[in-house]
Amino acid sequence: MSTGFFGDIQKVRYEGPESDNPLAFRHYNADEIVLGKRMEDHLRFAVAYWHSFAWEGGDPFGGRTFDRPWFSNEIDAAKLKADVAFEFFSLLGAPYYCFHDADVRPEGRNFAENTRYLNEIVDIFEKKQAETGMKLLWGTANLFSNRRYMAGAATNPDPDVFAFAAATVKTCIDATKRLGGENYVLWGGREGYETLLNTDLSRELDHMGRFLSLVVEYKHKIGFKGTILIEPKPQAPTKHQYDYDVATVYGFLKRYGLENEVKVNIEQGHAILAGHSFEHELALARTLGIFGSIDMNRNDYQSGWDTDQFPNNVPEMALAYYQVLLAGGFTTGGTNFDAKLRRQSLDPQDLLIGHIGGMDCCARGLKASARMLEDGALSKPLDERYAGWNGEFGKRLLSGLSLDQIAGEVEAKDINPQPKSGRQEYLENIVNRYV
């Protein structure tokens, strides 16, 4: 039954590239076959509960701009929010959603009340998933908004905060498992520091390693089959965050022996904040064997902070999904829209329009990347660039020859290499032809 929040808006349909209907897909066709698989199964879109239904439209200089009937800290308001959210999921047609515990339940007086509220909402979600066919891509715990976490959760100097956070994660993993979630995410928004003057760096890293080990142990104990994911971010809200980027996370996982247990959920905007391109982080995660899932959004390149806008840059999406396809595609992961409306976008239909545009943009990027992959448009020039390493001398350099033997061969054969063009402009033009 309709909540009435979205008025008489009908389910979003695919109408093709010529459509001028703002509430229709022009490029995202769930059943279209791309590289032998349905587009929906490639992209595995998810709606973020927090930005879509919990964010109030505030910024550092002003408070709430959105007027939503569920904006109160009451269980009945949380139930109304769930009704509206699942109505939205059904209208949009994305197959997945994601949530933090604090997005879906009221804030209780203590841990027990938080848990009771969460379980009450999970009861509702179970029924709604059965009714709608919606699935949970991942669940997580909000370990950054409440003032108890101002100095971190896993890295807090107070062991009571560590314990409260660990207990909260336990309940959220339970909820995720119960709802059939395919992943569990940890984002350490407060796991970092404002100043080293009051920070024991060694201790905090060890505590963070212990916390993550507890999560992995509990996953196996209860038989949760999903993937544990860390979401890197360099800063904000902390000055420096410990899971800075993919490379940093990999080093952390290696140090604590968790590199085979945990993968990464990579956000476009966080990659930009870390001084990387999105495809760099995806390519590195793929290379290191820890690619898991993505949070899709974009940052304003001039602002210098995390603006969480919906994606609208097709060439960027093509390069991103090219890396996803090279990784073999998603397994348990997917494309979660960690994106929010602008604070002036007040109408309920704006929420649909933002997601529609983002889904169309990703679909165009996927199709372009699939064509590039099929045609060998980028792989053939890459193979040519490194072809020398497939020869006899290249193979001996990598296995067998010592440093003095290499020096001897260079002198004996009068090896005097000349540089070759990297052909960057040619390759960039190829990408532009496909998008």
From Swiss-Prot:
GO molecular function, one term: xylose isomerase activity
Catalytic activity: alpha-D-xylose = alpha-D-xylulofuranose
Localization, UniProt: Cytoplasm
Annotated active site: 100, 103
Keyword set includes rRNA-binding: no
Top-level taxon in the UniProt lineage: Bacteria
Cofactor note text: Binds 2 magnesium ions per subunit.
Binding-site list for Mg(2+) 1: 231, 267, 295, 338
Enzyme class: isomerase
Entry EC number(s): 5.3.1.5
Gene Ontology biological process: D-xylose metabolic process
Protein residues bound to Mg(2+) 2: 267, 270, 306, 308
Keywords carried by this UniProt record: Carbohydrate metabolism, Cytoplasm, Isomerase, Magnesium, Metal-binding, Xylose metabolism
A cellular component annotation (GO) from this entry: cytoplasm
InterPro entries for this protein: Xyl_isomerase-like_sf (IPR036237), Xylose_isom_bac (IPR013452), Xylose_isomerase (IPR001998)
Cofactor(s) required for function per UniProt: Mg(2+)
Protein family (similarity comment): Belongs to the xylose isomerase family.
NCBIfam families, per database record: PRK05474.1, xylose_isom_A
Subunit structure of this chain's protein: Homotetramer.
Name of this chain's protein: Xylose isomerase
Species, as recorded: Brucella ovis (strain ATCC 25840 / 63/290 / NCTC 10512)
